[in-house]
Structure formats: C-alpha cells, structure tokens
Amino acid sequence: MSVGAKAATVRTARTRPRAVAGRPKLEPVPKPLKVAVFTTSYPRHDDDFAGRFVSDAVRCLRERNVEVEVVSPGVYKEYGLVFDGGGIMHNVKQRPWIAPRLAWSMIRALRRAARDADLVHAHWLAGGVVALFCGKPFVVTLHGTISGGFLDDFRLCRKHPGLVRWILGHARAVICVSEALGEAARSTGAEHVFVIPNGIAIPETVVDEAEPLEIFYTGRLSPEKGIKQLAEATKGLNLVVCGDGPLRELVPNTLGFVSREELERRYERAAVVVCPSISEGFGVVCAEAMAHGKPVVASAVGGLLGLVVDGETGLLVPPGDTVALRAAIERLLGDRELRVRLGQGARERIIDMCSWNEVTRRTLLAYRAAVEPSMVEAQATAGLWPLHER
C-alpha cells in the first residue's frame, strides 16, 4: 500500500465513531429543509399590508425550523434587479420595454437565492414562470387577483389554460387559497392540488362594537373590490374606510392605509364589515373580520364563498348588486342578536380553518409532496413535519 493510501486510511479511521456494544448505531442528523420563496408582493415595512400573508407564512415556517430565503420587491436591489417603486404592474405599464430585462433579473435573483435550496415556493402564476427557470423542484401558490390586472390567476386560468397547464404541469405541488381557485387550477389539468387558505392571526378576545354603529371596509380602492357599489350602497350610513387606490374619489373620507394597531382598533369598533368584491381569490379582510367575531356582508364570489356560510357566519349577496348589498347591511344594523350570532359563528369557523398552526402544518405536507422521498422520511423522523395528514 502506498504512503498516500495509508494516510487516507488513518484519516478515515479517526473520523469514524467507535462502535460500542449495546449502543445503537448513530445516524446522521437531517438538515433543516431550505426553501427559496419568490413573491412579487411583500411588506416593505411594519405597516405595509402588501403581501403580509406571505411574510406571516414565512415567519411560521421559520418557527418550524425551515430555512427560508425571500426574493421580493423589498430586497430586489440586493440582487441587482431593475425594480423601481410603484409595483411591478406599474413598472411594466409605464415602461413596457423593461419587461424582458425585469423578467431576466428576477430569474437571476431567484437562481442565486435558490442555489442551496431544496425547494422553491413561488407565489402567483407569474411567480411560477420565474420558478420554472431555476432548475429546482417548485411549489406554486395561486392567490387570485392582482389588482384586477392581466396577471390575475383566475383570468389566466380562464383565458390561457394552455399556458397555465404548462406552468402547473412543471410544479411538484399547487397550493390554492380557496376551493374556487382549486377548481380553476384543476380545469386546466393541474394535478397535486392542495387547497390551503391563508393563515389568519386570531385575537385572544372579542371586543364589542362601538356606538354609533360603524360599517367598515378596508383594502384597495379599485374596481374589482366593488368600491363603486360600496359607495352607492352606503349613502347616508356611517361608513368607515381604510385604504387607497384609483377609486379614492368615490370615498373621499377614507383614512388611507393605517398602522396594524389602528386597523385592529377599527375591526374591534365595527358593527358590520363589508367585502363587496367583484372578484376575490381568498378574502383576507373577510377572514380577519370573522376572526374578530364580526358579522360580514360579502359578495358570493371566489374565495368568499369558502369563508362565509350565508346566515351562519355572515350574509352573502350577488356581486355587483347594490340593492342587495344595502339591504343586507341594513338588516344587520337593525338586529343586534343576529350580529352577535353571526359574529360568533364566523370566529369559530376561522379558528377551525385558518389558524397559522393548521395552515403551516398543511403547507409542510405540500412541501412533503414536492421533495425527494428520502428527505421526507429523514425530516419526518426528526419531527420537522408530520408524516400523515390528520
């Protein structure tokens, strides 16, 4: 045997643990799952509500010992992207010639972040396109609307099923935040579809409504949110609005976007929360109001249908129907017993459906479907995720 071979043999012997009679063989400790998250909507500061459900999901995954790196507008400059304020849709509409460069810079940024990742988690179908070019197993989440734009998940499934089939066909798992989105995804031929709602923070206590009774709306002031119908249906009523957007002139007394603490206070004060959307992938505002024990009046559309059980957790009205919207609001304002009953039912439903513990557990099951079986068993043995669906 050569000298080099002897040296190699010695080094190997020194690093191998000595077997001890009666002691079980030591197994290597599995490394935490590494996930690169790509999203075009993410909070840039504490009071920014853009994509907050994504940042909350990231926090919960990290609490489960998942290593997560996020690529989002807030960190684009770190990756040398050409993002320039106002949102991606705004950038592309104002300067369409930057679209190819912007797309390539996103791909490059995600490739860099995902270099050591086991999995990529892309949000929205547009994010799935970027994930396709990273050479990693990926999961894509469909959220629904993107300010009613041409990249809206519902619109893409309906208008371009072939494109959607191509994107989702390469995904190891498809997460949809509502059954309506799940049906839209399946209609294109998508497989491995998981319907997992957005997680919602559940307040410990419920605060009684304020006097005089307030009708509350919060969110983007844009056509797909039913702002025109909201303004018409609430004429002469005590409407409180938090939000901003292109239809701000229809609700000139809006408080604008407020801090999280102020938003919580507004939920607590509300007698009725209104969600008059024309299109809605999930309905974060609706779910948050329900978590606060507030009765909601919501459009019977999209993800809102999966949250509100008419007459049990709120009242549903046809989307765009101003007369029905007004009637439902007035019915609740005139019946405190009904408000209390619907509010209690709403809170119980959201606790069952949307607690972050449950949503994170189910997300990890979707990740489980996307990674190699050997890693699944090692991670499950280490207690990093459950082996079986409950």
Where are these regions (language model features)?
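Short alpha-helical donor nucleotide-sugar binding micro-motif in glycosyltransferases
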Residues: 168, 258, 265-270
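Membrane-proximal helix-turn-helix segments that form the acceptor-binding/catalytic region
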Residues: 111, 157-173
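Short hydrophobic beta-strand element within catalytic cores of glycosyltransferases
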Residues: 295-298, 308
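Short His-centered aromatic/hydrophobic patch
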Residues: 122-127
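Conserved donor-binding/catalytic core segment of Leloir-type glycosyltransferases
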Residues: 36, 207-225, 231-240
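Carbohydrate-associated surface elements
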Residues: 180, 199
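Conserved acidic donor-binding segment of nucleotide-sugar-dependent glycosyltransferases
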Residues: 310-311, 315-322, 331-336
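Aromatic "clamp/platform" in nucleotide-sugar-dependent glycosyltransferases that forms part
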Residues: 278
